[in-house]
Amino acid sequence: MDKSKQPFHKTKRSFRRRLPPIGSGDRIDYRNMSLISRFISEQGKILSRRVNRLTLKQQRLITIAIKQARILSLLPFLNNEKQFERTESIPRATGPRTRNK
């Protein structure tokens, strides 16, 4: 039997279960900044459930805690400090200016 007629077989990979990102003793609260900061991107956005590997209930509680921390000014709404930094100076024209009337 040639290769084109053989049934397709998937190669078996070893499956290693990852540890849950939130332990049973962790309390999801707006004051627990070490826990909350793990679920926020560099821009300050809330990461999705698929990225966080959380259950629906955990993701909902994390989202509420992050929003409460933002309202109480414990977290910024946006994290774009790089927006106001200038890396290069922009050359400006220093010659005489003429107006068109």
From Swiss-Prot:
Residues 1-23 are annotated as: Disordered. Gene3D superfamilies: Ribosomal protein S18. GO terms for molecular function: small ribosomal subunit rRNA binding; structural constituent of ribosome. One of its GO terms (cellular component) is chloroplast. Residues 1-19 have a biased composition (Basic residues). It is found in: Plastid, Chloroplast. Keywords: Chloroplast, Plastid, Ribonucleoprotein, Ribosomal protein, RNA-binding, rRNA-binding. NCBIfam families: S18 (TIGR00165). This is Small ribosomal subunit protein bS18c.
